């Protein structure tokens, strides 16, 4: 079987970068995973910790723990020149345009003429990413936006730039389909593409509505989970899974590139939960990858949840099954779902 790419690297060993590397390893292919050099004796500590997280993840990110042996750790100081051997490099660094642009310029000085470079950006248009790059780079550049968790989320948004070679788009679609098991969806070069243009707005509305309706995070997640077409994590659990800091960057990026007057601004950085999110990030509560987020562990190992009103924590409570059941019934009937409806319906169950 012909493999479109024989030497692959991922730059950025965060949740998404490590997940992408893990799925490449699941396909039986080796991959180089780079991150910033760490202080101390082990400059590869960031990428090494990423592999440890893959091995401990639940549900499992790797089909077999031995697949981790196919992921080679490195850092962008000592191993950057090794990228000259690659024919596909996936950028999965922080969602900031300035950092991505700086990386591309550095890449252009070392990569071989036929190397394909793609970004895992979830929101930034390709026209902005490569606006300062030469034509030879732009024709080999595309966006491959995976979703978290990479092993289980089948969708891949594939975005072509004005100058991207059609042959390269075919190679990317072929590899992701045949080897990574992705459902490849071609997307236009618009802010947020398809998934995040709709999905991030929906999540932000969920945060604001929970605050406005005076819901607990548990109640909100029971209501705005499966009945609303959102994963069983619900809104706040999904925020924790994605990363609260990453979501803040995504919101910031969308506000910087969407036209003034777009409905997104009403639920973005000016939303009622925004100050709480900013303070959580400042204190290191960035979600599952950090000290916790809207849900977090107490010192005794028990689960706590945050109060949206004042940011205090309390023991996590189980929501009444009637809430989720009522939401599902209301959704099936086509009625508008509100907390008042749910409480009334709960009483009748």
What residue spans do the PLM features occupy?
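Conserved small/polar residues in nucleotide/adenosyl-binding loops
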Residues: 340-347
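NAD(P)+-binding Rossmann beta1-loop-alpha1 motif at the extreme N-terminus of oxidoreductases
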Residues: 1-53, 110
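Interdomain hinge/lid region at the active-site interface
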Residues: 222, 226-299, 304
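Intrinsic disorder at enzyme termini
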Residues: 286, 293, 299-328
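Rossmann-like dinucleotide-binding core of oxidoreductases
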Residues: 192, 197, 201-222
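Rossmann-fold dinucleotide-binding core
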Residues: 113-197, 232, 315-317
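Amphipathic alpha-helical segments at domain termini/boundaries
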Residues: 26, 33, 63-88, 171-181, ...
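Rossmann-like NAD(P)-binding element
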Residues: 37-42, 55-117, 124-126, 291
């Amino acid at each position: 079987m012909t493999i479109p790419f024989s030497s692959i690297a991922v730059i950025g060993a965060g949740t998404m970068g490590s997940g992408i590397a893990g799925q490449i390893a699941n396909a039986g292919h080796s991959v180089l995973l780079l991150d910033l050099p760490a202080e101390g004796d082990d400059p590869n500590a960031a990428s090494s910790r990423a592999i440890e997280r893959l091995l401990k993840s639940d549900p499992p990110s790797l089909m077999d723990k031995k697949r981790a042996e196919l992921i080679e750790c490195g850092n962008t100081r000592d191993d950057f020149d090794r990228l000259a051997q690659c024919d596909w490099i996936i950028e999965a660094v922080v969602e900031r345009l300035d950092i991505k642009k700086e990386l591309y310029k550095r890449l252009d000085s070392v990569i071989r003429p036929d190397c394909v470079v793609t970004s895992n950006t979830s929101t930034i248009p390709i026209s902005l990413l490569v606006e300062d790059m030469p034509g030879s780079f732009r024709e080999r550049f595309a966006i491959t936006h995976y979703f978290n968790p990479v092993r289980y989320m089948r969708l891949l948004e594939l975005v072509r730039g004005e100058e991207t070679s059609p042959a390269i788009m075919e190679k990317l679609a072929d590899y992701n389909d045949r080897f990574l098991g992705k459902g490849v969806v071609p997307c236009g070069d618009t802010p947020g593409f398809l998934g995040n243009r709709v999905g991030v707005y929906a999540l932000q509305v969920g945060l604001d509505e929970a605050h406005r309706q005076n819901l607990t995070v548990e109640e909100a997640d029971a209501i705005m989970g499966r009945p609303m077409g959102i994963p069983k994590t619900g809104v706040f659990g999904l925020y924790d899974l994605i990363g609260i800091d990453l979501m803040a960057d995504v919101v910031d990026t969308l506000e910087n590139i969407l036209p003034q007057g777009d409905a997104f601004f009403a639920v973005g950085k000016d939303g009622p939960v925004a100050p709480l999110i900013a303070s959580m990030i400042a204190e290191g509560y960035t979600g599952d990858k950090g000290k916790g987020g809207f849900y977090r562990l107490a010192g005794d190992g028990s689960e706590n949840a945050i109060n949206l009103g004042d940011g205090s924590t309390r023991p996590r409570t189980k929501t009444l099954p009637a809430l989720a059941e009522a939401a599902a019934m209301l959704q099936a009937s086509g009625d508008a779902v509100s907390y008042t409806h749910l409480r009334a319906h709960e009483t009748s169950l």
